[in-house]
């Protein structure tokens, strides 16, 4: 380092301290960048492999889930129970629905709007009648490795009545929380 007329000559100790401070600042920056990268990688893996964040793609589950609501789902569960609300893919589109039948269950939908699973009428909180769609014959036995999914808004939703049973591989996650869009 060269001294100018206005600079005081520096001692060796001062020069060493200044260079050490520069090295420590650079090391701190690298450490911060590495920690940030690890945190971002963890967040990516957490939300791409363990949990699902998705916006409800329509009113298939109205009134329980409305179009635009934020859904938080658990991806690691593969054994779905009846009445679990799930996010699944059918015909290339993400959809939501309620699991009503599992492998070997017999689903019957008659012309009067009655839904039977293994001979038992399904009522619950559903206020819309369930009518069969063309193409799927009833009684229908759910194949192994599949689930039968219906939307709660039965008169407007596309679901297993249209697509048949949904393969477990096409079910992305079980919905564990719904955050209403209007509350954000």
Predicted regions span which residues?
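Beta-strand-rich cores of mature extracytoplasmic or soluble domains
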Residues: 135-184
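Conserved S/T- and glycine-rich ATP-binding loop of Class I adenylate-forming
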Residues: 68, 101, 149-151
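Short secondary-structure boundary/capping segments
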Residues: 62-63, 77, 99, 132, ...
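Protein maturation boundaries and topogenic segments
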Residues: 1-95, 164-184
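Short, surface-exposed linear segments at secondary-structure transitions and domain or protein termini
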Residues: 105-110, 130-137
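Generic structural signal for buried aliphatic residues
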Residues: 71, 86, 107, 147-148, ...
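PP2C/PPM family metal-dependent serine/threonine protein phosphatase catalytic domain
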Residues: 117-134
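Extracytoplasmic/periplasmic/luminal assembly and interaction segments
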Residues: 78-117, 122
